[in-house]
Amino acid sequence: MSLCFNNIQIFTGENFSLHQEINDEINNNFSHVALLYPEQSPSAFKREPSDIRLLIVIDGTWKKAFKIYSLSVNLHSLPKISFFDKIKSSYRIRSSSKTNSLSSLEATNKALEKIEPDLDTKALTKLFEKMIDFQIEKMGEEIFTKNYDKKKGSD
């Protein structure tokens, strides 16, 4: 994502509860902050997309993202952006039985489309597609077909 947008900050870790920079951003901009994180049902505490100026994204596997969220108690009170309409993932090398199980990049892209409708996110989508093509190329067509291509792999 940092290849496509210049107003992005990346922090690495598992527990951001005491992370000074993140806490300063949350405290100074609370009415304009949202967390991109799945919820089971729409919550009562919502934020209009146009009000969001800071979007916090947890990037990792589902298990890792859950752990980061669980440990980072400073994120628990933030309003969340979740998707309740059915969205099909384009991540062809990932299989998940969960509804709306988008990659972090896909979910961020969808969130940005809601937050900033005039923002051109095509570069992000193209980068994502190239990354997938590269990974398929490296694993080989046979492995891709066997493990991920449901149309061909089920023959």
Regions inferred by a protein language model and the residue ranges of each:
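C-terminal folded domains that constitute the principal catalytic or ligand-binding module
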Residues: 54, 63-155
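S-adenosyl-L-methionine/SAH cofactor-binding core of RNA-modifying enzymes
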Residues: 4-70
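Residue-level signal for inorganic ion chemistry
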Residues: 1
